[in-house]
Amino acid sequence: MSKIRRKVTVENTKTISDSTSRRPSVFERLGPSTGSTAETQCRNWLKTGNCLYGNTCRFVHGPSPRGKGYSSNYRRSPERPTGDLRERMKNKRQDVDTEPQKRNTEESSSPVRKESSRGRHREKEDIKITKERTPESEEENVEWETNRDDSDNGDINYDYVHELSLEMKRQKIQRELMKLEQENMEKREEIIIKKEVSPEVVRSKLSPSPSLRKSSKSPKRKSSPKSSSASKKDRKTSAVSSPLLDQQRNSKTNQSKKKGPRTPSPPPPIPEDIALGKKYKEKYKVKDRIEEKTRDGKDRGRDFERQREKRDKPRSTSPAGQHHSPISSRHHSSSSQSGSSIQRHSPSPRRKRTPSPSYQRTLTPPLRRSASPYPSHSLSSPQRKQSPPRHRSPMREKGRHDHERTSQSHDRRHERREDTRGKRDREKDSREEREYEQDQSSSRDHRDDREPRDGRDRRDARDTRDRRELRDSRDMRDSREMRDYSRDTKESRDPRDSRSTRDAHDYRDREGRDTHRKEDTYPEESRSYGRNHLREESSRTEIRNESRNESRSEIRNDRMGRSRGRVPELPEKGSRGSRGSQIDSHSSNSNYHDSWETRSSYPERDRYPERDNRDQARDSSFERRHGERDRRDNRERDQRPSSPIRHQGRNDELERDERREERRVDRVDDRRDERARERDRERERDRERERERERERDREREKERELERERAREREREREKERDRERDRDRDHDRERERERERDREKEREREREERERERERERERERERERERERARERDKERERQRDWEDKDKGRDDRREKREEIREDRNPRDGHDERKSKKRYRNEGSPSPRQSPKRRREHSPDSDAYNSGDDKNEKHRLLSQVVRPQESRSLSPSHLTEDRQGRWKEEDRKPERKESSRRYEEQELKEKVSSVDKQREQTEILESSRMRAQDIIGHHQSEDRETSDRAHDENKKKAKIQKKPIKKKKEDDVGIERGNIETTSEDGQVFSPKKGQKKKSIEKKRKKSKGDSDISDEEAAQQSKKKRGPRTPPITTKEELVEMCNGKNGILEDSQKKEDTAFSDWSDEDVPDRTEVTEAEHTATATTPGSTPSPLSSLLPPPPPVATATATTVPATLAATTAAAATSFSTSAITISTSATPTNTTNNTFANEDSHRKCHRTRVEKVETPHVTIEDAQHRKPMDQKRSSSLGSNRSNRSHTSGRLRSPSNDSAHRSGDDQSGRKRVLHSGSRDREKTKSLEITGERKSRIDQLKRGEPSRSTSSDRQDSRSHSSRRSSPESDRQVHSRSGSFDSRDRLQERDRYEHDRERERERRDTRQREWDRDADKDWPRNRDRDRLRERERERERDKRRDLDRERERLISDSVERDRDRDRDRTFESSQIESVKRCEAKLEGEHERDLESTSRDSLALDKERMDKDLGSVQGFEETNKSERTESLEGDDESKLDDAHSLGSGAGEGYEPISDDELDEILAGDAEKREDQQDEEKMPDPLDVIDVDWSGLMPKHPKEPREPGAALLKFTPGAVMLRVGISKKLAGSELFAKVKETCQRLLEKPKDADNLFEHELGALNMAALLRKEERASLLSNLGPCCKALCFRRDSAIRKQLVKNEKGTIKQAYTSAPMVDNELLRLSLRLFKRKTTCHAPGHEKTEDNKLSQSSIQQELCVS
């Protein structure tokens, strides 16, 4: 992280130990020279200003360090007795609790500093220990700098004036230190700042000396090279205290938030430093940096000297324990400090004996700090905070000199950590938790004071992240260390690794070996040095160190106890912290984490930060008092197990001292000079006490460390085992996934093989199909070549499409049928399986997230789930969908890829799901293909039907392949949407492009020919698609059974109805069967419908339902049936069925198609034979509807009704239903071309109406609502809207009206909710989908039953009206054809591009919408009522409740869109008005609020603005893909597009919008994206309170927060302002820019565009100016 220069007052343990009265010199702070040498100036330093031993130097570097009035006098002045110092420390803690907490990071150097902190606090506050920025360091930087003042002020007990005086003293000291450090800079560079939290540091933690807090907050977290030098300063300032400072920086980075050392040991000087430090640390950051550099040199030199002395002396004195504790403390802290501990470790613990290790350590710590700057900061500071705290008690006893030296001598740290790691781990864990919590609480509290909470939260999140990462890295490292421990035990590891693992494990091994060897050496040296030095410097410092070490050891024990209590791993974490600090020093990130004793201990600090934040952050003085008491208690507890009596006595003494200090802190604020003297005395006493205590503690700590090490080793082993287990699990999971994938692939391959064999057999039976298969193979090869030449053939694709379309148009129906069958079989091979669960494929496909990611995924998911594009979009795995979107124009070339890839994806699923379905399908296909063949032969055009059966067999093969090759079907759906959807898509394409309409004609002729077989294959494809799509819904088996039953029934019905209505094999035509069904439907239409044109017209009629075509051609079958059956009875049932089927085609294409076919047959039978309608429709409908309701209903309600019907309710559905129905009647009356034209025109009209919706914000209802239908299936399924839609389609006008009016409000609400939920409720989608699906299954079952009853009623009505309306429809369609054909031409141009991507969505959507429109129109109007009836049906539907708003939209679209739709006939108006009146009455009845209800009973959704649901027509989702809608959504920039193209686009969009007022606002913003953004914002805002989800009455917090966020965003946020705040622009500047823009547009744009440009340019320029 970036180096944060923190003003950290680092107290030298040396100075503290030397004299409490005099402010310790930098060198004394850097490390205690031996007691006398602490007072004795280093001769080398006096001569050269440089000392090789740096911080380890036993002698005072600089005659003036003490002489600057603070060092010796401040330290050793008996006026500042240790007790007074402690009391002052406590008082300062209490007074400066916030300050020390702020400065704990800064001043974690030590309470020595606290004692001398008044003088040195300034220095150390000025000492900018530049820590690498970690989230914590950054947090603490801000915190301790700003909150230092705040904390200084925060600890108001600490007088600000006193703080100023202390600050001034500190400044003086810092000046001296800066001079000294400048002199010793070179040596400091050599000397590693061993930020081992020495007992002083622990004391400083306990008595949060400002220096400790500063250092704890800033130095380590900021630890960078300067942090190391600052750490060196800390070490210098308190060589022992600097380890403590390091630990206290770690723990006080934690504890600065904890605000107060937990140990009662008095850190009085710290408050002074804190008080002054906060203010002057900033001033002296530069000085402190310089001082840090010099101190780093001195610290290194002194560290060497001290290490030598410590090695010599502490070897005799409590060697292992102290050193372990300091070393581990330092290890935690120093490795936290960065490389210091690591470098110390990297030489190996043996380096401890050598002065060079300190240099290396010093070098490494800076390096590591910089290397792992943020880890070092945040980690090392937490580690320092955490790991040192535990180790501080021994280190405290050693004295901060020892700790600094130990931190300098990393091996000592290793030994001490090994010894103290048990204790240290506990204490560190507890301390570091507390200190980290304290530091974080204080630093965070200070941050909170200084930082916005967002910054704090970010930092905390960063810290938490880092902690987690560090925990993870620590766990890894710990496991490594456990492994390396064996290696490191031998010290055979990489120096760093050996250090880190030595730190982690060598502390154990070294405890075993080095602990006795090196700890005896180094701890004895450092302790003898530290204690002798402390004694030489001053027994006060030693006493202080001891008392602080006691308090810190208490803190450590307390923290160890806490950390044990909190985190049993904390000792391990502590060891990790030590190891990890080393390891983390090795890996800078691991530095952070391991320094954070462990990731878990770090997080546990976060887990329990409130304990510490609570204590320190909230009440630093309280935390100091009570936190220290807690620490004492915990330490006593922790230490009592090790040396309960000693620690209890010491802790009691420390508690008494700290309590005295805490009591005196309030008193001593004005007597800080006396306190300093008393502190010096107390420090000397405490030093002596602490030396003894440290020895005892060191022994106990060594025991504890060993225990902790063992525990840590066990934990690490367990973690390793767990990691290995997790890895094994992951491997097993991966293997299982791979196996499953392989199985899926094998299944797909087997299915492909089986399908190929079937196709071969069928090809043997049918040479035509063989030729078609050859053509398919050729086209596959071509498509493969196209895939190879994909980019080259991108250009040729459109040409090929056009050629194919033209060829298909030009070719004879059979030629077209052969080619299309082959192509469609390609498509079928790919498409039924795409049908299968494109949803699942998406979900399972790796590209699903990428492809469907974001809005595309949501929208496409919506569209795919809503728009029944089972073959295409759903089955298209996201990759395929991506491919489809990318290359739908390229799809012909990419078809083989998609087919193969989607076959891979889908066939995997299909092999699983469809393996049985394929068998069933094969059986049903064979049976029904034969049935269909016989029926088709029996039916009209036996030759055609044979061709159809042949093609149906081919298509059955293809569909088996398609179902097995869902992606092939997708690709072929894409190609087949180019080819097969030249059947389906070209039908839908007719909606967009007449060429495809022609193709659709020929395609549907093909379909008619191949109806029977394709019916079977379609049904089976629908079965598979049900299984794949339906499988999402549980009743897959039921669906299969029902589908098979329906297949049988369809075959029977086909036989009977083919006998009756020869063309009525429609129910079985699901996708491809629609060809045959269309043929039969054409014939039936020809035979049945008097006005029906010859079968070519009928064949054209099935194409008119592109929705059905895409669906499974179910709607084309339904349309064929509707057309054949005069589109009244049949279209009602067929539309109901196809509505069910169309949505269900996604889910239940088979049932939907079968049911739609059955109902189509029923309706046809009804039309042809009303008694049959009553009998067969009643029988078939009721059982089939019930079945459908159960299986289809569930799936439908899941996807089909909710998505399909909700889609279909959109304008496209109503328009298309009207259009398709009228198209059917027109086709019946006028002709297939007219129908196709009408379809294209109607679809264009639908687009227009939907674009009007889009402009109105209805794109939400049609587009967004349709998205939300798919997305928030729940809202519609769960919402009565889906039920309404079901009811409106199936229910009688009354039941529909009532249900729908109820549902309308819910539907409107939910549509708006879903619009909003499109964004807001996408999270709800999954849950909502499943929940409403279940609800809607039942509802849809019931409603479909009601529908069929109502359908029968409506069919009678509609039959009467169909005759009159069909004539009007012919007129209307002719008009609309003429009107829309021009639009379709432009739409074709725009959509030709969008077609590839959107057509397929549109085709499926249009199929959905057409099928749903047909269903609605047939159900609602019960008759295909011309284009007027489309509006009428839209209105009737909306008036009937489902589509009231939709129909209103259709009305507005039809009427307000420049009368794109012809006026509604009187019959239609009567029905619409009747339905309107009924539904409005129902709505009013529902709207009428009952008498005051219980709040729970109130439907508060009534309070929501009941936006009249603009008729959501079935193809609402298709609106998204109309060129206008797409351009609206995508937006078009006049500048980029040019005024000419812009004018065209605007024209197209305006045409499609059908609302001139909306067209004016089409491109309000010149930046296209802004238009859609503004639209979406409007929709979002409008629907905020509407789309509340399935449980509208219960507003969940998530929804509430989402609403609030959106409200803030939309109304107050910058989003709207960025787009709309044109007033921000200077008017003159705007005028000039407008002039320039006009000139540019005049140059670039034709004259006619200039006006638009001027109009648009003014608004858009304003916005551009705002935006740009």
Swiss-Prot record:
Region described as Disordered: spans on this chain: 1-38, 56-157, 190-1112, 1125-1466
Gene that encodes it: ZC3H13
Cross-link (Glycyl lysine isopeptide (Lys-Gly) (interchain with G-Cter in SUMO2)): K179, K194
Entry keyword annotation includes Repeat: yes
Pfam family, one: zf-CCCH
Similarity annotation: Belongs to the ZC3H13 family.
Subunit organization: Component of the WMM complex, a N6-methyltransferase complex composed of a catalytic subcomplex, named MAC, and of an associated subcomplex, named MACOM. The MAC subcomplex is composed of METTL3 and METTL14. The MACOM subcomplex is composed of WTAP, ZC3H13, CBLL1/HAKAI, VIRMA, and, in some cases of RBM15 (RBM15 or RBM15B). Also a component of a MACOM-like complex, named WTAP complex, composed of WTAP, ZC3H13, CBLL1/HAKAI, VIRMA, RBM15, BCLAF1 and THRAP3.
Organism: Homo sapiens
Biased composition range(s): Low complexity: 204-213, 323-346, 370-382, 584-593, 1084-1100, 1125-1153
Lineage: Eukaryota, Metazoa, Chordata, Craniata, Vertebrata
ZnF (C3H1-type) residues: 36-64
Keyword entries, A-Z: Coiled coil, Developmental protein, Isopeptide bond, Metal-binding, mRNA processing, mRNA splicing, Nucleus, Phosphoprotein, Repeat, Ubl conjugation, Zinc, Zinc-finger
Coiled coil: 645-789, 1300-1366
Residue numbers carrying Phosphothreonine: T237, T263, T354, T364, T882, T1033, T1170
Biased composition (Polar residues): 10-23, 239-254
Entry GO MF terms: RNA binding; zinc ion binding
Name the UniProt record assigns to this protein: Zinc finger CCCH domain-containing protein 13
Subcellular location: Nucleus speckle; Nucleus, Nucleoplasm
One Gene Ontology cellular component annotation held by this UniProt entry: nucleoplasm
Function statement: Associated component of the WMM complex, a complex that mediates N6-methyladenosine (m6A) methylation of RNAs, a modification that plays a role in the efficiency of mRNA splicing and RNA processing. Acts as a key regulator of m6A methylation by promoting m6A methylation of mRNAs at the 3'-UTR. Controls embryonic stem cells (ESCs) pluripotency via its role in m6A methylation. In the WMM complex, anchors component of the MACOM subcomplex in the nucleus. Also required for bridging WTAP to the RNA-binding component RBM15 (RBM15 or RBM15B).
